[in-house]
Amino acid sequence: MKFLILALCVAAAMAGPSGDQIAAAKASWNTVKNNQVDILYAVFKANPDIQTAFSQFAGKDLDSIKGTPDFSKHAGRVVGLFSEVMDLLGNDANTPTILAKAKDFGKSHKSRASPAQLDNFRKSLVVYLKGATKWDSAVESSWAPVLDFVFSTLKNEL
């Protein structure tokens, strides 16, 4: 069964976004990737259930924790993982590393994250990107397959 899942992930990677799509998404991402706190804030603001999944933030006022070192550190980890995957995209030799990162994510999040929460995270990320980057139909058509690949790879490990 594990082999089948791995084979499907590799097949998804091979059928993933084109080089041009990856390049356009990376260029867009590079303009906001250092806004880690703002990105996580936007995700939590739109999805309080995701915030409550993190015990250190559950039940706390989002605006009051946004500027704290704990929030900043956690935003760095969450958005940092996405940035690492974005950096690895575009080189087929990096596929095993991407899959390993997804597997690590799955191990650490299996008990507290759901595919639905990842879908909501993705939607909130897109809303953030639309407001914080130059977003047009070309950028959107580049991001869609990149996000499909990244989030399906992560969800496969939950």
Curated annotation (Swiss-Prot):
Q: Which residues form the signal peptide?
A: 1-15
Q: Any idea where the Globin domain is?
A: 16-158
Q: Where does heme b bind?
A: 74, 109
> A single GO CC term, please?
extracellular region
Q: Which UniProt keywords apply?
A: Heme, Iron, Metal-binding, Oxygen transport, Signal, Transport
Keyword Transcription included in the entry's annotation: no
Gene Ontology MF term list: heme binding; metal ion binding; oxygen binding; oxygen carrier activity
Q: Which InterPro entries match?
A: Erythrocruorin, Globin, Globin-like_sf, Globin/Proto, Mb-like_M
Domain of life of the native organism: Eukaryota
What is the annotated quaternary arrangement, including any partners?
Monomer.
| Family that this chain belongs to | Belongs to the globin family.
Q: What else is known?
A: There are at least 12 different components in Midge globin.
Please give the name of this protein: Globin CTT-I/CTT-IA
Organism encoding this protein: Chironomus thummi thummi
Gene name on record? CTT-1
